[in-house]
UniProtKB/Swiss-Prot annotation:
One of its GO terms (molecular function) is metal ion binding. Its main location: nucleus. The gene is ohgt. Likely a component of a DCX (DDB1-CUL4-X-box) protein ligase complex. May interact with pic/DDB1. GO terms for biological process: positive regulation of neuromuscular synaptic transmission; positive regulation of Wnt signaling pathway; protein ubiquitination. Residues 75-85, 170-181 have a biased composition (Acidic residues). GO terms for cellular component: nucleus. It comes from the Eukaryota. Residues 159-168 have a biased composition (Basic and acidic residues). Residues 1-113, 158-195 are annotated as: Disordered. Residues 22-31, 86-96 have a biased composition (Polar residues). This is Protein cereblon. Belongs to the CRBN family. Residues 227-453 form the Lon N-terminal domain.
Amino acid sequence: MDEEENSEINSVQARNEDVQLEDQSQSQGLQDRQVDAIEQAWNDAMPDEPSPPAEYAFQDPLAIVGEGGDAPEAMVEDVLQDDTVSEGSHPSSDMSLESPGSEDDSDVQGLPNWMIPQNRLRSAVDMMVSQARNRDGGIAALLSGDNFLQRVRSMVFSQERRRSRTSEETSQEEAAEEPDDPPPQQPPLPPIDIGFDTNLPAEHSYFGNHLSRVPGVDYLEVGSVHHMLIFLHHHILFPGEVLPFMIDGQMFDDDMPGLDGLIFGVSFPRLQPPEDNPHKLYGVTCQIYERGESGRGLVFYKSRALQRIVINCDDIKGSPQYIARNPTNKCFSKVKILPEYFLPEPLQSVDMGSMARFRDIPSMRDKYRRFQLSTTTWPSDACQEYSFASIVERARQRLESQKIDTMPKCPIQLSFWLVRNLHLTEKMMRLTFLTDSVNTRLQLIKSTFKDETLFFCRYCNSSLALCSDLFAMSKHGVQTQYCNPEGYIHETNTVYRVISHAIGYSGEPSTKFSWFPGYQWHIILCKFCAQHVGWEFKAVLPNLTPNVFFGLSGSSVRIGKASEYSPFNGTTYVVRNMLRMISSDME
């Protein structure tokens, strides 16, 4: 009897084990089919064809205007979305960064073949998730399957290896065919006149017409120490720049004596102090010259940077706050006014007596200069190297295409103005700000005249635009500070065009609070990392030129040399965003 019972129990257990094995086999088969579905969608979306050559490819809105005046179509609709991006997460963008994924495949052929068409990938993921939810264990069982995420990563990196291999083969073929050819250059811009009043952005008319003037422009004595209200700022300001901001009026009203404009300090934590003074903060004094009510309990202010200052951190009383983040606490400190030393040109220091009158006669200037050189022990190259006039002329030639006609004549003001309009690297900006010698500052600027620079995304290092495509939509130059309705201050760089496939769009275009009257703005994102990098401005009024241009946010881009350019810089971030998107859809 016992033997019969044992055999019965064993047969039942064997049947149960067979059922479990069959279920596991079906479950594993479903997981394999789901992963195969992703792989098939991936392979369908990413055909095996040569990568595009590493050359500058630009969209040119000016050419479109010339062909009929129609506005250009959106370059990219299917922006790679970051699951951390949500409304309000980017106060700098003025709008929500959420935008629906594109279901249109019409632009897939226009994308680089190593990028991820989001609509196809999402459809595969949605199918896989919907199937997993109907099975025992749901999404958790799918994620805990054998090497599921490892297989997805392997799929991604196999495509990356193929992209790298085809890219190297293409580069080798091009090098073998044309070994002596120089690297490809960007297509030249057609000549265009600015059909826009550049005084309007400089007046910051988006604040409204109810601002009142605050008289008083006070330059403080060099080397003097003053006790004043201080703030922090995420951009480096140079004397002469306008800083618009929106803040609680109680921060200033008690400190504003009568009708005299208030002077306060703005320091820059990004500006690293010299190694011998690690406990110093550098900044500028700013003076308010206009104010007006915003109607929301805040006050609009316009201020102008006047002089460089240095702050000893031990003298700060309170906790300094960023001026762009609606500070609520006052912070005071002692500040010291830094000097600006300028030595005249070597030949102008030579006393030529009565012959000096020939210096100002245009027809005699060259002869007079040659005569001066013959009477000095300095070689002509040394005199030319430190010639203020030669630096001004070379800067004028370099900025000729940017339609700027407001170059100051004072050497001190000119040195700061050139830093803002020539777009130096962060290292060079630091050096030019910290030096007290105007001559040294001009020499540093001169050393960058031959450099070709680009705008790179600060988050993923992908290329966005050429600095040679900068132009002035404001009388203050190509770089201007603007304030959005939330009080966030943007350092905006205006360019004619951006590199093709470098950006996507978010949200809907709007004309509200436009920094350029007559233009609508539309948020643009980096195509690779989906971070906010600026705005597209498109004319909504007739007879405005250019019809389309772009404003790059200084907090989202950096300046780098053209030698850093690579059309594949953002690949790592594409992979990261894809894996994050899969994980978020499965939760």
